[in-house]
Amino acid sequence: MSKKLQVARIAEQTGLSLSTVSRVLAGKANTSEKARRRVRECAKALGVLEDMAAGRLLLNSLVVFAPRRAFDERSDIFYYRVIQSINKALEPHEVRLRYCALEENDADANLFLARMNDPQTEAALLLGIDDPHIHDLACDVGKPCVLINCRDRKMRLPAVTPDHRAIGENAARYLFEMGHREVLNVLCLRRYTMELRLAGIRDAWEAQNLAFDETRHLLTAPDFSARGSEALVTRFLEETPAAALPGALLVGGDFMAAGAVKGLQNAGLRVPQDISVMSIDAFNLAAIEDVPLTAVHVPRDALGEEAVLMLQQRLIRPQAAVGTLLLNGTLDVRESVRRVRPGRGSASVQRDGLYD
């Protein structure tokens, strides 16, 4: 059936005008909630909603709930860029995007309910909100809701998140493939997502039949800052004999990697000639002190786009099965990791040509 005939059929059965039905199916803002509901129900009953709504977002107002720091680029550049990706994904649609700051845990439930029960709120995206009570309330309200980089432990809400465990495993596996065996992981374990990365790193150790010893292979940072990691690595170098130093550092974030590199350089160690450094993320710092970082990129910019697409599908098929979309990371090989050849010493790193 052609689009024109579909619109005419829906208009006939709902008693609405052709122009109203067309505006609803196009996701236009100048339609009432009552009209939108009638058109959606009729289109669904006729079995034409999915075909007609492809590429459209059948709502006019969306709220993004996120920790307060997510709205400040200097406080949390990762979440800030995720929000930008949500904005970009919504550009083709006439959707009013609003924001509400919530704590990750122990969030203000009354504030959340007030925003969710606002007649202008048709759907929500929850970015990095771990509070299980908020997840319960989101289910009770019943409006379409998608989680980003967090999870509903009761498995009721759809989610989009990086595959943190696989990302951690992939990063560690690359270092092993480059010949490294003594790898020190510098991680902040403040959130369960970082624990998942550590679990993946342990998986890589196990795949190599190596024993992971936290006293030798893990430095736990208090935060994700460059200053904290620099101090941590500096103290480690002061307390560790030169013969016992690792061949590589696997660092769990951009700014942490910057701090780690600075700590190594302050101690007179070169990257990667003396110690290799690999990062997870590395979107924000392409080069640190002229050292282009090898890294596994977390799929930051894809999170917003995929969340909007998932929300679109929930609007079309609200009774569809609920699940979590795990996004893979991407390995970006640059110059901060050297290859170690077993039994032949390290592969030399030369920045000058043979005849320079």
Question: Where do the PLM segments sit?
Answer:
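Short, well-structured alpha-helical segments in soluble
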Residues: 107-121, 228-244
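N-terminal helix-turn-helix DNA-binding module of bacterial transcription factors
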Residues: 1-58, 354-356
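Alpha-helical structural signal in soluble globular domains
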Residues: 42, 85-89, 137, 196-208, ...
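Alpha-helical recognition/docking segments in bacterial nutrient-uptake
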Residues: 2, 59-173
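Hinge/beta->alpha junction and helix N-cap segments in small-molecule ligand-binding domains
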Residues: 68-81, 99-107, 160-170, 186-234, ...
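Flexible loop/turn connectors
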Residues: 234-356
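Periplasmic-binding protein-like
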Residues: 120-128, 182-188, 219, 241-253, ...
